[in-house]
Amino acid sequence: MSKQNQWIVGVNAVASSVENDADNVREVLIEAGSKNPRLTEIEEQARRKGIDVRRVNTQALDGVGGQVRHQGVAARYAAARLWAENELEGLVEAAAGRALVLILDGVQDPHNLGACLRSAAAAGVTAVVIPKDKSATVNATVRKTSAGAADRIPVVAVTNLARCLRDLQKQGVWLYGLAGEAEASLYSVDLRGNVGLVLGGEADGLRRLTREHCDGLVKIPMPGEIESLNVSVATGVTLFEAVRQRLGA
């Protein structure tokens, strides 16, 4: 896994990092004078785990949070936890025929990526695959939006998405791409075995080459007047149809 230094902000994101990955939290900054009990809990847990904690003014937190609302807390974090492409094979093998892989083809808005990761973690996915280029990466905004989910699931960054899709197929992963013009409904296909769910970016959807590497295309039926969903909403709908089938509902 590759690592990089970054700041994460927000109560849920910092609390999750302190709880789940304390070894990679370098320090925690908390707004001086705050009486928020959640911040007190974070401070106490961080100190118990040997993490440096500093009380600072709001301006200092504004400086590390940028445009992201910090909620009075920030942490300097050492790991982006991006898994290498060659680690994906082992993750699929370990799923023993029930791998559920989410492939995001060029989701560029970090808020959308964070929301997708949150849904993916809730659905218990095996891994999330993103391209290294033309895609949001796991930055502070993504961590905050994901409410800590970015720390809980493998995010695999790949150089060549088409090659990655071929490799998944060689492992017996059946790839379904989500496309509004598809004839088959999401609710008509079997999502219980080794399955990869492929969703495109906000503007253009699935790229041509990505589409060509899918084993099938499906759509979410929309009887209303709106014919499209935000990618993070579509991700949640698609993942939890897979969950429903796998639970036998």
UniProtKB/Swiss-Prot annotation:
A GO MF label: rRNA (guanosine-2'-O-)-methyltransferase activity
EC number: 2.1.1.185
Pfam families, per database record: SpoU_methylase, SpoU_sub_bind
Keywords, ordered alphabetically: Cytoplasm, Methyltransferase, rRNA processing, S-adenosyl-L-methionine, Transferase
SUPFAM superfamilies the record matches: alpha/beta knot (SSF75217), L30e-like (SSF55315)
Annotated S-adenosyl-L-methionine binding sites: 200, 220, 229
UniProt catalytic activity: guanosine(2251) in 23S rRNA + S-adenosyl-L-methionine = 2'-O-methylguanosine(2251) in 23S rRNA + S-adenosyl-L-homocysteine + H(+)
Any one GO CC term of the record: cytosol
Localization, UniProt: Cytoplasm
Domain of life: Bacteria
Chief location category: cytoplasm
Family: Belongs to the class IV-like SAM-binding methyltransferase superfamily. RNA methyltransferase TrmH family. RlmB subfamily.
Entries under PANTHER family matching the protein: 23S RRNA (GUANOSINE-2'-O-)-METHYLTRANSFERASE RLMB (PTHR46429:SF1)
HAMAP family: 23SrRNA_methyltr_B
Summary of the function given for this chain in its UniProt record: Specifically methylates the ribose of guanosine 2251 in 23S rRNA.
Protein's UniProt name: 23S rRNA (guanosine-2'-O-)-methyltransferase RlmB
Species name: Xanthomonas axonopodis pv. citri (strain 306)
